Structures are given as C-alpha cells and as structure tokens.
Amino acid sequence: MAVNYLSEILKILHRKPCSQAELCQQLSLSKSHIHSLVSNLITPGLVEKVEQTEYNQEQGRPRQNLQITHNLHYCSVLIVHHSWEFKAYLLAYGVTEEIASKELKQVNTVELFIKEIREVIDEFAELYLPEREAIKAITVATQATIEQGSSGMMYRNNLLSDENVPLAKMMFDAIGIRTFIYNYAYGHMLTLLHAPSLNTENAMALSCGEGSVALGVFLDKKMLLGRNNSFPECSHLPFKYGFEKSLGIYGPHTQEALMFAICAIAPIYNINHVIVAGSCFDEHLDIIYKVQQELKRQSDPLLHNLVIEYRGLEIEQHLNELIYLSFDALVEVLNPQIQKRSLQDLVKGYDGF
C-alpha cells in the first residue's frame, strides 16, 4: 500500500511542531516534495505556519515551524477504559485540552459498553457541538488482547466478558462513527518510545502494575507489533509462578519473573537495554538493582552487559499519547489527498498576478 505522506506529516505534527527541513529528514523526502505536500495541508486549513519564538537575530528572519491548526469542525471522542476508570473525552482536532469529559459507569458486557459510549456521544453533541457529524472518529484505549486500529478485533478483555468480537465494527454499526481500538498500555509504550531522554534504538520495555504486564520491543526507534497491529501478549510466557501474577503486582516471585523475562526475550532481538516501568516497582527499586547484579554474573556477554533503567509512570504524558492517537485516527478518517491544481490556479499563486 502506498504511503499517504500527507497523513504522515500530520501524525508527526500532532506530537510536536517542526520545520519543513525537519520533515525532510524524518520522512527522507526532498525539499520540493515536502513543500508541495505542506501546501496541500495549508490550503484546506489543517496546518499553519508560525514563527519560532526563540531565534538569533543575527541569522536574519526567524525560522517558521508548521503546526496543526485548531479545528472545531473536526472532533473526536477518546474513551479511556481500565479497572480504575471508564471516561470519555471530547476533543477538537489539534487541541490536547478536552472540550468536555465525563465519567462512565463500569459495565461487564460489550453491549452495555457500547450503550454507555453511544449515550455520552449524543450528550456531547447536544451540549457542545453544532451537529453530531462534527465527531469524525472514536478512539478506545482498553485493557484487552486486540488487533489495534480500525480492525479492532478483540479476543479478550480484562473488564468485559465477551470474547472474540469485532469491537470496532460493532461500535460503528451501533453509533455510526468510525472506531479505532488500542490496548491501554500502548499509550504508555508510546510515552517511552517518544521520551527524548530514553535510548529506544535497541530496547525492550516492561510496564508492570495494577495486575497486568505490558511488553514493548523497540528497534531503530520503532515499536514491534504483531499481525494486524496486535499488541504483544506476554501474559502467556511460561513462568512457573504465573508471569502476569508475579509482575503485575509485587510479590515473592517478582525478582525471578523479571530475570526470566529479560533472559527469555533480550537474546532473541540482541537487545542491550531494558526499560522497567510501572507501579509494581515504585517502592521496590532494590529488585531492579538485584536483577542488574544477577545479570552481571552471567557468562553470556549480551546478558552481562545489558543495562536496566527504571522509569516512573508518567500519567499526564500517557494521556497525551492517547490524545495523539485519537488525532491519528481522525486523520485516517479525513484521509487527506493531493489536490490537482489547474494552470490558472498555479498562476494565481504567484505574486504579481
């Protein structure tokens, strides 16, 4: 499938404004190609140019950055669904602060789950929007084994009794808005992936806490996913005391489970850096130190030289990554395309005509 570079540019700008030169570098495209693409985003009002606030006056005119244009005509709804929270956020495109939010009632079936979401969307539309059609996409972040994105096939969910259901399709059929489903922990993995101070060139990440474990493998600053964008399912790793039970909550076998995970996975990808995060280790950092010392006693040079780094759970940035995902989903719906321009339009674009 051909890459839609207009969508790729928007997804980059969701997370951080940047210059055309930076886009050239990130997408490996020529200046003229990027200039043409950006023009196709500025004209419909999806992107705007802004001058950098900090620059050296001796260098002449300040550089211009590109940023997403705040747009109330394109809205999305983000659903955050886990054991301690079921909440809906109404978002305008390009604005990370929600228009509105509402706590929803925890339910245990997909039918009731969809009913709660349909009702809050109708409420948001009536109270805050000129029309319901302004909501272009729904993004759900939940604790589930799923094929992520628009496929949205859910095999099991820690909070819902239904199994093997096409959740995204069921929501679209019931609500009439395209839906994208993600594992809740995917947002945390994206937080780690995009953290400027972390080395994600070659690393594995384990997020442990609240009774669950999430695994991320980063190679060349990209996260590995399974078939149809499936989020890695690590709970079935054959640890004798139960892998998720031992790392999801601190207990007598947590140290052994962490060592097991590192020794089982790191050699497969020749990984030399492990990032450990989550509430399981917040008050037990000595466990990480002990595992690091145990690795240094290994004869295998890969394990001997492997470095473990602890990273606290950054809730605010985690939510921001989920918001960025909702913007990405909205772009999939908008599906921007190159607009062919006539000779007359091109002539009008030049000064003096």
Predicted regions and their residues:
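Short, high-confidence coil segments that cap the C-terminus of an alpha-helix
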Residues: L29, I135, L198-E201, I271
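Short glycine-aspartate micro-motif
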Residues: N65, Y74-I79, I135-T139, A203-S207, ...
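Short coil/turn motifs at beta-sheet boundaries
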Residues: Q59-R61, E133, N199, C208
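Glycine/GP-enriched mid-protein hinge/lid loop-to-helix segment characteristic of carbohydrate kinases
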Residues: S101, M170-A266, Y350-F353
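ATP-binding/phosphotransfer module of carbohydrate and carboxylate kinases, centering on a glycine-rich
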Residues: M1-V50, Y55-I99, T109-E126, P130, ...
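Glycine-rich phosphate-binding loop and adjoining helix at the ATP-binding site
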Residues: L23, I99-T191, A195, D286-Q298
